Structures are given as structure tokens and as C-alpha cells.
Amino acid sequence: MKKRVYIETTVVSYFAARPSRDIIVASHQEATRDLWPDLTAEYETYISALVYEEAGKGDPDQAKMRLAAIEPFPMLDIDDEARFLAEKIIAGRGIPADYPEDALHIAVAAVNGMEVVVTRNFAHLNNPFTRRAVRRIVEGEGYVCPEICSPQELLEVDK
């Protein structure tokens, strides 16, 4: 049975972005592009309406590329249950109140039984302090907390 994976908007942005001249950013883009075929072949991959909305913003040509990249993935609903959990994540200081969308990504994934959230957002999602706080809050609300990881980390699992 395939693992259920939720991809957050930063992953889509790195996948569809013009190649960077910055060597570190370019390596992140390459890892994200390396993972992309696995997202359809190896995993049940999902997005949410929030990912779709965020991917459609910005430069029209880039937005078109981002939206085309996520077109094959089923979209999860953002319901009251997810909104309530996102509020709990913020209230419990898992995610800063200034970034409610980040809490909503985690909440949508948890409510829908995703096993993994793949993100490039290290500031508010994928760092050891956030992961620990989010896990405590999500599990305290009775959900299984998805693992939060980068594309590189998920690629390592594939090896």
C-alpha cells in the first residue's frame, strides 16, 4: 500500500521555479525535481485547496507552471475540522500566529490521514522545535501527526 503524502506549496514552487544560480538553492531545486516522479509512482500524493490557491499567485507564467505541476494530484478539502485544528496549532504555539496558512497545511494533512507532509518551509514547518510542538498539539487533539520532512529526506527513504 502506498504511503499518503501531502505536498505543501514551497515544494511546488521549487519544482517549477527557474533554475537558480545560487548553488544551494539549485541543489534544493534538483532534489525536488528528483522526487517529483516518485510523487505519482511511489506515493498517494495530495494537495489542498490552499496549495492550489498559493500556487496560482505571483508571476502568471510561473503560476501556470505550478498549477500544471499539481494538476494530477487529488485536492483535499479544507473543512471546519481542519480549521479548528489549525487554530489549536496556533493557540498551542506550534506555528506562529502570523502564519495561519502553515498551520492549516498541517491540519488538513492530519485530519485527512496523511502520513507525511513534504515542505521546504524550514522557518515555520520543518525544524525540530516546530515538529515537536506540532506533534504534541496534533496528537493531543486525537489525530496522528504526519511526519514533516523535506524532499531530500523523502528521497532518502526511497533508497
Feature map (PLM): residue ranges:
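General small-molecule cofactor/ligand-binding pocket signal
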Residues: Y46, L76-D77, E147-C149
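Short secondary-structure boundary segments
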Residues: T9, A49, R120-F122
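Active-site neighborhoods of divalent-metal-dependent phosphate/nucleic-acid chemistry enzymes
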Residues: F73-A133, L155
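Residues at the C-termini of beta-strands that transition into short coil/loop
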Residues: A49, D79, Q152
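Short, well-structured N-terminal submotif of metal-dependent ribonuclease cores
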Residues: M1-I47, E54-L67, F73, A91-A97, ...
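Short, charged/polar low-complexity linear motifs in solvent-exposed/disordered segments
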Residues: A31-T32, D102-A103, V144
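Acidic, PIN/NYN-like endoribonuclease modules and their adjacent C-terminal/linker elements
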Residues: K2-R4, R18-D22, A26, A110-K159
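Short, flexible, glycine/charge-rich loop motifs used to bind or transfer phosphoryl groups or to couple energy/partner
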Residues: L35-W36, A107-V108, V138
